[in-house]
A protein has these predicted regions:
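A short, amphipathic edge element
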Residues: 52-59
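Short, intrinsically disordered, charge-balanced linker/junction segments flanking boundaries
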Residues: 211-212, 220-227
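A structural signal for short, hydrophobic beta-strand segments that form beta-sheets
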Residues: 57, 169-171, 200
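Short acidic/polar mixed-charge low-complexity motifs
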Residues: 53, 86, 190-194, 219-221
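N-terminal type II signal-anchor transmembrane helix
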Residues: 1-52
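A short, sequence-level motif marking secondary-structure junctions
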Residues: 62, 97, 198-204, 226-227
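Contiguous, well-ordered beta-strand patches that form the walls/edges
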Residues: 180-183, 188-212
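Flexible beta-edge/linker motif
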Residues: 11, 32-39, 61-188, 215
Length: 227
């Protein structure tokens, strides 16, 4: 009788567990029911407002639940925010936009959690460096952007490539606890491995600190300044 009771209790637990698992999987699949054009427009709008990323709306978007719920975009392009002339500033082979799981029942409350960029090419001109420097003094999104296995192409005024930075991995976000913009990059230039770290406080008193280290050259540079 005790054995039957144990088996019965186990069966109830197993059935309950499987039932909850199926309900959870069904919940995770709800974004598949969202209208595709709505998803595309919503993603584009949220990327622009939260990350200042102007994504080309011709990109095709699919939804996946593994490793966690996200929209997957293959072969996308990022355009400049210049209203007069849209210039391609990056092409991304694989872009993953991870979602918060708080409320999939109400699509209007869809919230982005973080971004993952893989196999991307970024194109920068001399004037872009000043723009990036100005933007780095403003508050980043507190949602992380991770970049892996990508390249930065520096170009001159004739559109010729003068240098290539290969990115192994990089992260960019605003740390809510430390109240700091953080940007960390590990990569190489001219086949020389290096790490670059940037911290700044986008508050009333704006301070910026960066460090550059290339161990193979026995080179380490640090600088701190008020903006």
């Amino acid at each position: 009788t005790n054995n039957k009771l144990k088996i019965s209790t186990f069966n109830k637990f197993l059935i309950t567990f499987i039932g909850i698992l199926f309900l959870y999987l069904f919940y995770l699949l709800i974004p598949l029911l969202y209208d595709k054009s709505w998803v595309k427009n919503s993603i584009q709008s949220k990327l622009k407002s939260e990350f200042k990323i102007n994504l080309d709306n011709s990109s095709d978007i699919t939804y996946r639940i593994l490793p966690s719920p996200h929209f997957f975009i293959k072969d996308s392009k990022i355009l400049s925010n210049d209203s007069k002339k849209k210039v391609e500033v990056a092409d991304i082979k694989y872009l993953r936009i991870f979602l918060s799981q708080k409320n999939f029942f109400n699509k209007e409350k869809m919230s982005l959690k973080r971004l993952s960029v893989n196999n991307a090419n970024f194109y920068l001109f001399k004037e872009d460096l000043k723009k990036l420097n100005d933007k780095s003094s403003k508050r980043f999104s507190n949602k992380k952007i991770r970049i892996n296995k990508s390249n930065i192409f520096f170009k001159d005024s004739l559109n010729e490539i003068i240098a290539i930075v290969k990115i192994d991995n990089a992260t960019l976000f605003f740390d809510d606890k430390k109240l700091l913009n953080l940007f960390n990059l590990k990569g190489n230039i001219f086949k020389i491995p290096f790490t670059y770290k940037l911290k700044n406080t986008p508050n009333i008193i704006k301070k910026k600190k960066f460090s550059f280290e290339a161990k193979s050259l026995n080179l380490s540079i640090e600088n701190e300044s008020e903006i």
